[in-house]
Amino acid sequence: LPDVPPVYGITRPVQTWNPIKINFQHLWLLIQDAYRTNSWKDKFRIWFMPTGWRPADVIERYPVYKIDDPYHFQKYAPEASVALRTWTWIQFLFTFALINYFFINIANIGTPNIFVYGGFLFLCVFAYTELMDKNPYAWAWEALKNAIGLFLIYQNGWFGMSETMPWGTVALASYFVLSSIVVALFARSLTFYS
């Protein structure tokens, strides 16, 4: 139909910026539906049915919000101040720099440490997207991320960074401290969220 504009997206909006939560929300719904349905047949076949299929008895008892009209719906766009948006971009760029360092030095970092580094990157993304969602516990995720980052630096430097960039470890440690302070300020002041 040439006169109907295409609409791209999903019919069950996730209402978060957090990609880790997004990946597990659908799995969690499948697990809950498999547990909640009374039909043993549905408990098994839910894992093999097309995307979006739910057992009939579960749909009635546990409805899930679904977009019925793709041309008129509320998009997920939480209000954020200029300060919060600016800090989010700084967090993103810093995480992007850490990812680039990881890929450039993956051979030097070594097998057990690449998993530590990868897990830390997941925590970085989780922490700043929780702040974007204005989760009241975003400060705790940020504090955990920064504490682990400082611990890793204290243990052995930042995965060989001091060999190529002598100032890099100090800059990274400073970022972790500054990040904790800034996110604590966001968490304490509601004016940052308006």
Which sequence ranges carry the predicted segments?
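Cytosolic/stromal cytosol-facing helical appendages immediately following the last transmembrane segment
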Residues: 1-88, 126, 132, 137, ...
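Substrate-recognition/cap regions that form aromatic- and gly/pro-loop-enriched pockets
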Residues: 75-163, 167-193
